[in-house]
Amino acid sequence: MINFCFDKIIDVSTSTVYPNLGAKLEGEFMDIVGDFSTTYPFSDPPRLLEYFRDEDISFTIHSSNDCPPDSFYFINVNFFDHAVDWFGMMSLSTLLHAQQKKFKILFYYCEGDRPSRVRNTLHKYAKKHNIDAQQIHFISHSSIANQVKNFYYLNDDEILFKNAQNYSNSQAQWHSNRRSKKFTCLIRSHKNWRLVVAAMLNKIGIYENSYGSYNKINFSDGFDHTDDFVDISNNPLANIPARLAIDVFNKIIPFSPDELSDTERNNYEMFVGKYYTDAYWNIICETHLDLDGTSGAFITEKTWKPIRHNQPFVVIGTVGSLYHLQSLGYRTFDGIINESYDYEKTDFLRVEKALAVIHELNTKSLEELNEINFQVKDIVQHNSKLFNAPKRNRLMKLIKQLLNSE
């Protein structure tokens, strides 16, 4: 069994705890629980423990002043600021216990920052406070986290999005009926590289046959030129000749096929069925194209959406995204489409190859895409079933790694 410790326990029976090193907020805990993630130093309540409860995985929680040996002092970080000295924020008693190795320190972080850089920052502050760096452990959303000692990988979004969609009882099924759109391609937030991708998609006519969107861009701040998109330091796709395409695309954005607010679009419980049941393929513009200069893959709810809802997809994201999905047990569509783009390490070349695949799909009629729909049936149904399955095995693997750590 794994043990965790916290400075302030609200209710042992429900494992409700005040987040370690969280902001000092006023009010009843349930009224302020959503504010920790947006308030410095951005330490959240530990949702990993919720996952354990959902999967009937045993664990215990204890006071950090009186905990079993090898307990984990849990810090759930919503945003990793390298200027934050986490150990310097500990109370004197908690810091003393850390120095005396009465517990291990476990960070939980759902982003893809370079693991080695995070390690170096934490070790620097640990040395400052006379804490043994080997006491520090870190769970990351980067697929290469395991390459760094005492770092571990868990795809939090695979569990979080599944739970949210289950809560809203949202599930699209595969069907054989004709669909009116070739693609769904939804981009909620602007990024320089996403603008290049979207402009090129527009150039080859994708949005004419899609449920498409490009949102959260505001020209009132002077953002009305292409200068930001031709500098490789600002845009990893600067080598793609997209200036004219961007000029054309700038005239039509923002646009959306729905009237949802940005908050609603970002809500994991949200479900718009037609995006999956009335379009044949999903074009995914993931969160990252390059994962902090590493070879890591970063899979978020953007990819889990079509997987849950029985829809084939093309991923424009980090190198090896499809390979990583396969390592998790999912199947992709090589043989039906050319997925060699996934192995291209150069970002702009990978995107160009993915765009070529999308263009090839777009040349097909709705009738032809409906025929392909039968070819992908077994794959998408396998993926949806796997996604919806319990994640106990993934979580038990993580626990085993933590308990076997030095």
PLM features: residue spans?
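Pol beta-like nucleotidyltransferase catalytic core
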Residues: 2-284, 290-300, 307-406
